[in-house]
């Protein structure tokens, strides 16, 4: 029983770390953005979304970045995914202008992803909810972050 509980805890901590890294990536993109769309579903997308729902649209000097939520692009991913389409990051973490626009899975196994723009409070509330089986039980993890919108133009 202890071994199973330890395995569940390790899995929970690993999935939580994946969520926090995903939120860090969005925060990094937001810090490099010049504008944010109030209606990402109406904005011109950085690439094909293949039926996924746009949840966040940023404008940067290197080009637009679209985050979308929905069906995974291939069977290797678990459940629904959060994808990022936009300029790639260089080794220094800065966005590279002029290159290809990769469309990559940020995190999989999602039940829900919410990006709520709260201009009156000057923040973006981003939430990721995952559900997965571990030790024969369903576990759910929810991570949320408030991201500062200071200096961003509302598009």
For each feature predicted by the language model, list its residue ranges:
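Aliphatic-rich helix starts adjacent to a transmembrane/signal segment
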Residues: 1-31
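Short linear sequence signals and composition-biased patches located at protein termini or domain-edge surfaces
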Residues: 102-155
